[in-house]
């Protein structure tokens, strides 16, 4: 198992130009500029609470709307996580966390299984948080899941303020990802699967 669990992804299309660097064993240091301020704020949560070092730069057609950039950042970040995990030897694999933010409480449960699946249950009453379309939260996680190969369940326990709900979601996600990707010392570098392999399908 490599001592450096980090990766870099560059992805360029006619709509976006994105670079992502991640170090899974970092200190929560981040440099993020996607051109979408609220998305930047949420990505900082992933870095800070997951203790992942994260650098993300994105240039996209945000003069049209934020959809392409938001989705493509999710794609690139998912690919970066999958690449940094490699064969996923020695990881804890499963993660879960409840995160509160004032009146909001969100539960995230996930499995770095190589089997992409998203169950998403956030009830966001506001159509926008600032200038950010709240429909894009789900689109981000769809893109991430499909390119990281994780099974992800997001459940809103309670909450009324859309900003609080989304931020609690990202905080819970970051802590669950931290739990799942950390090294299990008792496993001695083996793959955490009775099949003997985990891969992104």
Swiss-Prot record:
One of its GO terms (cellular component) is cytoplasm. Pathway: Amino-acid biosynthesis; L-histidine biosynthesis; L-histidine from 5-phospho-alpha-D-ribose 1-diphosphate: step 6/9. Keywords: Amino-acid biosynthesis, Cytoplasm, Histidine biosynthesis, Lyase. Its main location: cytoplasm. InterPro entries: IGPD_sf, ImidazoleglycerolP_deHydtase, ImidazoleglycerP_deHydtase_CS, Ribosomal_Su5_D2-typ_SF. Belongs to the imidazoleglycerol-phosphate dehydratase family. This is Imidazoleglycerol-phosphate dehydratase. It comes from Prochlorococcus marinus (strain MIT 9301).
């Amino acid at each position: 198992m490599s001592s450096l669990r980090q990766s870099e992804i560059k992805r360029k299309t006619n709509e976006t130009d994105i670079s992502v660097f991640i170090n899974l064993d970092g200190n929560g240091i981040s440099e993020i500029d996607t051109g979408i301020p609220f998305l930047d704020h949420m990505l900082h949560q992933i870095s800070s609470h997951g203790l992942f070092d994260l650098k993300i730069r994105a240039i996209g057609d945000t003069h049209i709307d934020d959809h392409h950039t938001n989705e493509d950042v999710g794609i690139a970040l998912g690919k970066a996580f999958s690449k940094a995990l490699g064969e996923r030897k020695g990881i804890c694999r499963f993660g879960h966390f409840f995160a509160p933010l004032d009146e909001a409480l969100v539960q995230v449960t996930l499995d770095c299984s190589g089997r992409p699946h998203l169950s998403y249950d956030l009830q966001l009453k506001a159509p926008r948080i600032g200038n950010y379309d709240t429909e894009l939260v789900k689109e981000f996680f769809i893109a991430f899941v499909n390119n990281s190969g994780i099974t992800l369940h997001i459940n809103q326990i309670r909450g009324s303020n859309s900003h609080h709900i989304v931020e609690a979601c990202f905080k819970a996600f970051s802590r669950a990802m931290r739990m799942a990707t950390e090294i299990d010392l008792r496993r001695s570098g083996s793959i955490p699967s009775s099949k003997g392999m985990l891969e992104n399908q």
